[in-house]
């Protein structure tokens, strides 16, 4: 009977492993085939599929001053939005968990609200504010970061909420405060290191959303990366496709880097736990 059960378990594990491989391959093909097709088009010299291929369009990316300016502005917007979002959300969410737990549902509703509002409706609300800012302060494209912080709130809130839910914020804070730590020390040296993976996830989501945003920038008459790609596609489709592929590869590299950093931190934490879990007197 035991032999039959063991054989059944091995067969089930083999089937599950094969199913995972099939799903992984299907997902890889689903994402990679369009990207490879875009890359092939961006390296094609003529209009025929059998035409010669080179990197002419890729080399022309930096020959477009408007495109370079749009890329620079989008990267700056992504950085500003990520930092502003973290500075706004992390202390607020920690404080609500510690001092105002009854406010958690209200905060969640406010943060998730932009997800239910179409982007074009947000533009209608943003337009008077940006018109006033342009007339009285500045119409620099970096002011879009105010709108983008609101836009990324739902996604970043969920990522940070999952990270804070995985640790005992109250116990860690009380322990640090009882040892004389200031609130800044509690936040910077106790809470943030324990939710570093969640912070990286939120930052990545913020960067990906800002780099891919089109509607708000277009309707507020700003020229970010996606707006410039759309305009460039009317004049030079090869360069616009090359830029689109490059932006996708950039997001992919960020994702892989995030996974690598998160894996390394988990391994270091496991080693630390094992080190302190060994009985005293035994060699390490």
Question: Model segments located where?
Answer:
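Short membrane-interfacial helix/loop motifs at transmembrane-helix boundaries
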Residues: 2-4, 26-65, 218, 272-273, ...
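Transmembrane-helix boundary motif in ABC transporter permease subunits
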Residues: 7-12, 80-111, 124, 128-132, ...
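Interhelical loop and adjacent transmembrane-helix boundary motif
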Residues: 8-13, 58-66, 211-269, 281-284
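Periplasmic/extracellular loop-to-transmembrane helix junction in inner-membrane transport proteins
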Residues: 11-15, 43-83, 234-235
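Loop-to-helix entry region at the N-terminal start of transmembrane alpha-helices
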Residues: 20-24, 69-73, 129-155, 196-198
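Transmembrane alpha-helices
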Residues: 22-31, 150, 157-162, 183-212
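Membrane-interfacial helix termini and adjacent extracytoplasmic/periplasmic loops
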Residues: 55-56, 103-104, 120-150, 184, ...
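Membrane-cytosol interface at the C-terminal ends of specific transmembrane alpha-helices
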Residues: 140-177, 185-191
């Amino acid at each position: 009977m035991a032999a039959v059960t063991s054989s059944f378990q091995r067969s089930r594990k083999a089937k599950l492993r094969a199913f995972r491989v099939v799903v992984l391959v299907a997902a890889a093909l689903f994402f990679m085939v369009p990207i490879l097709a875009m890359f092939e088009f961006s390296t094609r010299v003529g209009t025929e599929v059998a035409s010669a291929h080179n990197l002419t369009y890729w080399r022309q990316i930096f020959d477009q001053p408007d495109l370079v300016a749009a890329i620079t502005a989008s990267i700056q917007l992504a950085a500003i939005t990520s930092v502003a979002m973290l500075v706004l959300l992390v202390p607020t969410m920690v404080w609500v968990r510690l001092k105002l737990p009854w406010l958690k549902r209200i905060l969640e509703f406010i943060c998730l609200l932009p997800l239910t509002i179409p982007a074009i409706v947000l533009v209608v609300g943003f337009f008077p504010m940006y018109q006033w800012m342009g007339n009285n302060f500045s119409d620099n494209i970096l002011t879009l970061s105010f709108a983008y912080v609101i836009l990324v709130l739902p996604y970043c809130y969920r990522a940070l909420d999952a990270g804070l839910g995985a640790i005992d914020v109250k116990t860690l804070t009380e322990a640090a405060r009882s040892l004389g730590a200031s609130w800044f020390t509690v936040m910077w040296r106790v809470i943030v290191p324990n939710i570093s993976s969640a912070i990286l996830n939120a930052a990545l989501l913020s960067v990906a959303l800002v780099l891919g945003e089109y509607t708000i920038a277009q309707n507020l008459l700003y020229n970010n990366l996606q707006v410039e790609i759309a305009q460039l596609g009317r004049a030079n489709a090869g360069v616009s496709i090359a830029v689109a592929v490059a932006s996708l590869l950039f997001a992919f590299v960020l994702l892989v880097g995030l996974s690598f950093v998160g894996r390394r931190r988990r391994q270091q934490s496991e080693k630390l736990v094992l080190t302190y879990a060994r009985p005293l007197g035994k060699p390490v």
